[in-house]
């Protein structure tokens, strides 16, 4: 085969229906070396030159071949890439700067957690209001916007999207573990308490938050009072929909202990996409805890041992707690739901369907985000 026949097929991972692009390797660059002498970094430069509109910078792409993410310092020969092979291009985005969670006032947070924990167990309307808000995507997005550090904490995001886990973590006994390990989750839970308190009557009278006007809840970050929900879901407390006064100073829950800007910062598209992709849980569990069943549910949960012992919450422990929900969703139905994306991942050489299904479910079927999750640990 002559040097002029050396070519590769290039396909963008996020455009599965687009035709492949043929990349012919320049003969003058080869010299006495074969195609296999090219480095992956040089191949990226060639691809960026070929696909200038789609790939403006070679530093913003990863290359995938036979299910492996290619390292810049290796050669085509190292990965066994032959003429006519198809290389998949995974486009990256610039990483957003990490945000530090706001400090937590543990005394104030303990008081808020006690109010929330009591309300969840004694008021069915309050419990329903909390879980309706958390299962609504717009409301969850607003919580992410209003809570610095939440988008980069996958465990916290997962807890907010699972009813049983939320009930376990909203226990005041969890604070000693949550404050150092997941402060953003503590702040988010407090925001949930205040947001729902503005639209649904609290069952207990011993709460510092009850005396706050609804306008204060609405003005605070996270105090969105079901604005993302439909009108039929907003009937818990009609009077709470009064228009806030523009002159009313905004306030925040005391547990946040932060004197910065009260309004939510603008959230970037990549930050929100990453946050949602990392929330590797179903949208909600099929069972809403009730006062009669909650104790049994939390008692049998894999998280219950950590509640009693106060041990740190690890990713492995969190994954075990979510396994029941993943199994309940049914593997056959998942395979049917994500069949096109599964096939695309197989075409890239990723043959572990179970791994692919977990990544697809965590990202809502976003093939780009699923690939980033799969390769988060680096090339095998």
UniProtKB/Swiss-Prot annotation:
Show where the UBA domain sits: 333-377
Give the record's keywords alphabetically. Answer: Immunity, Innate immunity, Phosphoprotein, Ubl conjugation pathway
Name the InterPro entries for this protein: UBA, UBA-like_sf, Ubiquilin, Ubiquitin-like_dom, Ubiquitin-like_domsf, UBL7_UBA, UBL7_Ubl
Phosphoserine occurs at 230
Q: Biased-composition ranges for Low complexity? A: 239-255, 270-312
Q: Does the keyword Phosphoprotein apply?
A: yes
Q: What is this protein called?
A: Ubiquitin-like protein 7
In its UniProt entry, the species of origin is given as Bos taurus
Recall the taxonomic lineage recorded for the source organism. Answer: Eukaryota, Metazoa, Chordata, Craniata, Vertebrata
């Amino acid at each position: 085969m002559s040097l002029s026949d050396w070519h590769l097929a290039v396909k963008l991972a996020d455009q599965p229906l687009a035709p492949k692009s043929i990349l012919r390797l320049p003969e003058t660059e080869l010299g006495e070396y074969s195609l296999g002498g090219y480095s992956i970094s040089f191949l990226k430069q060639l691809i960026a030159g070929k696909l200038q509109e789609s790939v403006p910078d070679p530093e913003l792409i990863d290359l995938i071949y036979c299910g492996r993410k290619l390292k810049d310092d290796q050669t085509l020969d190292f990965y066994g890439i032959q003429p006519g092979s198809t290389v998949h291009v995974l486009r990256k985005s610039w990483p957003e700067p990490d945000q530090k969670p706001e400090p937590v006032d543990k005394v104030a947070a303990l008081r808020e957690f006690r109010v929330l924990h009591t309300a969840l167990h004694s008021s069915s309307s309050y419990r329903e209001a909390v879980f309706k808000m958390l299962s609504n995507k717009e409301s969850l997005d607003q919580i992410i916007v209003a809570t610095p550090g939440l988008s980069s904490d996958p465990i916290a995001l997962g807890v907010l999207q699972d009813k049983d886990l939320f009930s376990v973590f909203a226990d005041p006994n969890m604070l000693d573990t949550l404050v150092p390990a997941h402060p953003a989750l503590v702040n988010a839970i407090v925001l949930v308490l205040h947001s729902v308190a503005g639209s649904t009557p609290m069952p207990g009278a011993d709460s510092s938050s009850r005396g706050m006007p609804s306008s204060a809840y609405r003005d605070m970050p996270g105090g969105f009072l079901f604005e993302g929900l439909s009108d039929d879901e907003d009937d818990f407390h009609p009077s709470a929909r009064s228009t806030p006064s523009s002159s009313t100073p905004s306030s925040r829950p005391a547990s946040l202990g932060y004197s910065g800007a009260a309004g939510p910062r603008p959230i970037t598209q990549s930050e929100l996409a990453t946050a949602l992709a990392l929330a590797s849980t179903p949208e909600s569990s099929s069972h809403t805890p009730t006062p009669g069943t909650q104790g049994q549910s939390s008692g049998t949960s894999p998280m219950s041992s950590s509640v009693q012992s106060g041990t740190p919450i690890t990713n492995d422990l969190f994954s075990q707690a979510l396994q029941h929900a993943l199994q309940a969703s049914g593997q056959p139905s998942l395979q049917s739901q994500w069949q096109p994306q599964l096939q695309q991942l197989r075409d890239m050489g990723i043959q572990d369907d179970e791994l692919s299904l977990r990544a697809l479910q965590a990202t809502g079927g976003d093939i780009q985000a699923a690939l980033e999750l799969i390769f988060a640990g680096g090339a095998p």
